[in-house]
A protein has these predicted regions:
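Glycine/serine-rich phosphate-binding loop and adjoining beta1-alpha1 elements at the start
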Residues: 494-641, 681
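Hydrophobic, well-ordered beta-alpha structural blocks that scaffold small-molecule cofactor pockets
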Residues: 599-697, 701
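Flexible, glycine/charged-enriched surface loops at secondary-structure junctions
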Residues: 226-230, 285, 318-322, 504-510, ...
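Low-complexity, serine/threonine/proline-enriched polar segments
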Residues: 133-150, 527, 540-550, 699-743
């Protein structure tokens, strides 16, 4: 009886607590709470809400389809904090209820109802595409071209509670976001002081953490969220279907909690802030210290994040250990007042409506404030001053930015290259890290997990776009090492490649440039999806800064431009650039009215000259190889000789080089019957065979598979081996080798694998042709491995890959007797092809280009052979005359001389426009244009005509006896007619 009485008493007490809990909620919770909560949920909420003051933390119940939370609001318990719980969960909707202040304590009860997005069967469409179209027409005059296909991809299970009108209105945002890469936000007043925010974002742009970040931004802007709905509105197509992306539509109902938070100007800024969340980092130091603690806006925080990344890219060449990115960001966040003044100065200078403060005065005050920093720790203060002064210099060197653009996918900055002087003043080591020439222009790009540079050395310039995406390793302790190394080298890699490209471009009217982006692979999506999303985002941002109208002004009126010039940029394909992306970029530039239209990028499959298909780069390298063999007194048609390669059969340059080396003579034999390819080093595998790697097996893989698909059973020579970059769970790597005439297999340790992999290019051969691999693979610190005991492992190197060998290593190897044909000479034919492709696009319509494509390719290949052989003959002739001058130096001298003439003539022709004749232009073009399209030269922009004349005349001057410059030009023009 006593037990029963005790239980009855417990039940009575608990029932009383539930009644008290209900009575209190009835008193303090908004009426909407009781309308929206089910009896089942209320039964779960009441016990959690009872005596809440005596409970710590968050009371939570999680069910398969929902989550319920009850807590007293505090700094550590609030909707922003709880939203982080959902980073790995699929949430369909969230309703947040806040009570009135409690009597006595003033505390606020928060009750959250979270509905999970539980997988279920597909629903039949609630409305037909015809019904949706008819409803859409009620509100909007113009139908999006993709409305029907977008309506047909609606995820009906996620929108079943929406009526036809709301579906139609949301489709206006969804249709635009689906084919572009920015997010769109609309803010509407729905009565009183309540607002509805509708945000459409491509799922590929953000997944985990987006909801939490949105709540955090809204709180920082002075609002609280009362309820939210998160819907997967449309399903997406394949990863390469860039115009049919899955789109999520999130809706938030908010009310201001800070006076003036909903002022018109602040609501405009809020819209821009929310749009930026799709590509902003989450939960980092700047978010905590600047956005949350110091109430910076998201746009300002992103500006400062970009600044920290840029400063790190430069200070890496001052002292890499002292100025790591975390240290730079820590030093910056320690002085929020300085950062706010810098952000305010930047925002004033680039505000579309004009400045609101004196930029020069503001910067001077910031510099004085930095100079007066004194924490009592002199060594630390010195570093802080370097970092903050570098951030200040970055702000001062910005000439244009898409910061105020409403529809952006990344931050883009056009910079004054004078920023390099700032770092040279800090340390001499900075200047020594780069070639002596300084760029004409620099662009910098930044977004979540992506940063990059585009550097050019002349007004009109072209060069490839490569994306560096270090592959994460399994070891947690080492997973970020390769990325951090690439991050520290990003600016130098781009600079050196652009400088090399400038020397390489001596045969064409464009100077040299390079675009290099660094992607941090997260694994959140598959690699191609992450890669393509990053490339699209950077391209969209880049296009905003170079897309000028006929009036010479940027088409985006939100961008203030201090360059006083209309930049024209040309891009070419490079590492990690796919045909799908090339086509998309060309189409996008054409849609937005870019000066060159689809000519912004070369290498398009349908309207271009695909480098990989025609092997144009390798074709040029091959011409230099033939001349090198001649110098070595090797007749490839009869003599035995050996070659080693870096790069694999699937790649452009290496694959096509293998194709040329293994070309047959028409009778079943090889044109080079005595050739042995003794070593090939590719990312997935490396092979060494002293008897020569099986040529037919190697040819089988060309452009169809990577080197790891080579059949190890084809290894022949004693000591031959093949190692695979396929580690198991114990970091051991597969190896096949020939020993005692038998093929043996084993697993080797990582250290042994790396030693063999790195040393594979050091096996003896007559000629080494690097056709792939990372820049600076052979450098001042390791060139001795290539030449053990001072004996080089090859007689010559023909550089098919850019910057594979550092300048210091080149000189050291040449002193040991290695003949090196520099990259800027050897692999220039790819960019020559791209230049002709762009000119063809200007002169011809698409159907005309297609009609003459086969004949045009033949004429361009003839031109490539002429350009390569002419320079090769000049180099070897000069090399034999001037033995004391390394061939790489001769290559630089030739490029510098031609480029110097190009610049002089480009300027001189302003005063002598009569020298820019049609005859000179036609002399530079393939003969087909004079024969069939002689009336098209007016399509070439005047500045391009002048540049074409400058390069054609420069080449003819350099390769003939020199008179006075003007006399030489007049004689050449006269001879051309």
């Amino acid at each position: 009886m006593k037990a029963d009485e005790s239980l009855e008493q417990i039940f009575k007490v608990q029932a009383g607590k539930l009644e008290e809990s209900y009575a209190r909620l009835k008193q303090v919770m908004p009426s909407y709470f009781f309308k929206s909560v089910s009896t089942e949920d209320l039964a779960a909420i009441l016990p959690m809400a009872a005596e809440l003051e005596n409970k710590s933390g968050i009371q939570m119940i999680e069910r398969p389809d929902r989550i319920l939370m009850v807590y007293l609001k505090s700094e550590t318990c609030n909707p922003v904090c709880t939203s982080r719980f959902f980073a790995g969960k699929r949430i369909l909707r969230s309703i947040i209820h806040e009570s009135a202040p409690l009597d006595g304590s003033g505390g606020i009860i928060v009750i959250e109802q979270i509905t999970k997005d539980v997988p279920g069967p597909e629903m039949k469409p609630l409305f037909s595409s015809g019904q949706i179209e008819a409803e859409y027409r009620k509100f909007y005059e113009r139908l999006p071209e993709n409305l029907k296909e977008t309506a047909e991809s609606i995820c009906w299970r996620d929108v079943e509670d929406l009526d036809l009108e709301r579906i139609a209105k949301r489709l206006r945002l969804v249709c635009e976001v689906r084919k572009r890469d920015y997010s769109l936000t609309e803010i509407e007043n729905v009565g009183g002081n309540e607002y509805r925010i509708t945000m459409a974002v491509a799922v590929v742009a953000r997944s985990e953490g987006y909801y939490a970040q949105t709540l955090e931004q809204l709180e920082a802007s002075g609002f609280k969220v009362t309820r939210s709905y998160l819907r997967n509105f449309t399903a997406g197509g394949a990863p390469d279907d860039f115009r049919r992306k899955a789109v999520r539509v999130n809706t938030y109902y908010i009310v201001p909690v800070k006076p003036g938070a909903d002022a018109p100007e602040k609501m405009i800024n809020l819209k821009r802030e929310l749009n930026e969340l799709a590509w902003s980092p989450q939960f980092d130091l700047f978010e905590r210290e600047l956005l949350v603690r110091n109430e910076f806006c998201c746009a300002s925080v992103n500006l400062l994040r970009a600044a920290s990344e840029f400063v790190h890219s430069q200070l890496s060449f001052v002292d890499r250990n002292a100025y790591s990115l975390p240290e730079i960001q820590r030093f910056m966040a320690t002085y929020p007042a300085v950062l706010r003044r810098l952000a305010d100065a930047f925002e004033s200078k680039f505000h579309p409506d004009g400045p609101s403060l004196d930029f020069g005065k503001a910067i001077q005050e910031v510099r004085e404030e930095i100079a007066n920093i004194n924490s009592g720790m002199a060594e630390k203060d010195a570093k802080v001053k370097v970092v903050l002064s570098s951030v200040t210099d970055f702000i001062c060197c910005i000439l244009k930015s898409n910061y105020y653009s409403e529809k952006k996918t990344a931050l883009a900055f056009g910079l004054d290259p004078a920023f390099m002087r700032h770092y040279e003043s800090i340390s001499e080591s900075y200047g020594k890290a780069f070639p002596p020439e300084r760029p004409y222009g620099v662009f910098f790009f930044w977004r979540r997990n992506v940063s990059g540079f585009q550097i050019r050395f002349s007004e009109i310039a072209r060069g490839g776009w490569r994306t560096v995406a270090p592959k994460p390793v399994k070891s947690l302790l080492e997973s970020g090492d390769s990325f951090e190394q690439a991050r520290s080298e990003l600016f130098r890699e781009c600079f050196v490649l652009a400088n090399t490209q400038h020397k390489k471009n001596k045969d064409i009217y464009e100077g040299g440039s390079k675009l290099v982006t660094l992607l941090k692979v997260t694994g959140e999506f598959d690699f191609k999806t992450e890669l393509w999303a990053a490339q699209r985002a950077v391209f969209e941002a880049f296009l905003q800064l170079v897309n000028y109208g006929a009036d010479g002004k940027l088409r985006d009126g939100k961008i203030v431009d201090f360059t006083n010039r209309a930049d024209i940029i040309e891009i070419g394909p490079d590492e990690n650039m796919s045909d799908e992306m090339i086509s998309w970029m060309g189409d996008r530039a054409g849609e937005d009215g870019y000066t060159l239209g689809s000519g912004v990028i070369s290498g398009k499959v349908d309207t271009g000259i695909n480098h990989k298909h025609y092997g144009v780069t390798s074709f040029g390298v091959f011409q230099y190889l033939l001349r090198t063999l001649q110098y070595l007194k090797i007749n490839p048609a009869h003599d035995d000789f050996s070659i080693k390669l870096s790069g694999g059969p699937y790649g452009d340059v290496a694959g096509n080089m293998i194709k040329l080396l293994n070309a047959e003579d028409g009778t079943g034999g090889y044109r080079m019957p005595g050739l042995r390819i003794v070593a090939v080093t590719d990312g997935p595998a490396a092979i060494f065979d002293p008897a020569g790697i099986d040529r037919r097996e190697l040819s089988r893989l060309v452009h169809s598979a990577n080197l790891d698909s080579f059949d190890p059973a084809k290894l022949r020579g004693e000591g031959a081996f093949m190692i695979f970059n396929q580690p198991d769970g114990d970091s051991r790597y597969p190896m096949a080798s020939v020993s005692g005439g038998k093929l043996r297999r084993a697993m080797i340790a990582r250290d042994d694998f790396m030693r063999m992999f790195q040393a594979n290019i050091c096996h003896e051969a007559d000629v080494f042709i690097p056709c792939g691999g990372r820049p600076q693979t052979i450098n001042a610190g390791n060139y001795g491995l290539y030449a053990p005991d001072g004996k080089p492992s090859s007689k010559a190197i023909v550089e098919g890959a850019n910057s594979f060998i550092t300048p210091e290593a080149r000189l050291a190897l040449q002193k040991l007797g290695v003949v090196i044909v520099k990259d800027s000479s050897a692999n220039k034919c790819g960019v020559i092809t791209s230049s002709y492709e762009i000119l063809s696009g200007l002169l011809l319509d698409k159907n005309e280009f297609s009609a003459i494509h086969p004949k045009l390719v033949v004429e361009i290949m003839d031109r490539l052979a002429f350009c390569a052989r002419r320079e090769a003959e000049w180099l070897f002739h000069e090399f034999e005359l001037r033995r004391s001058v390394p061939m790489t130096e001769l290559s630089d001298q030739l490029a510098d001389r031609i480029n110097e003439y190009k610049q002089q003539l480009f300027t001189m022709l302003d005063s002598h426009p009569e020298l820019v004749t049609d005859g000179v232009i036609f002399a530079h073009l393939p003969p087909l244009f004079r024969k069939k399209f002689a009336d098209r030269l007016h399509r070439i922009p005047p500045v391009y005509r002048k540049a074409i004349a400058a390069v054609e005349l420069s080449l003819r001057i350099v390769f003939r006896k020199k008179l006075s410059l003007e006399e030489d030009v007049r004689q050449i023009v006269s001879s051309i007619g």
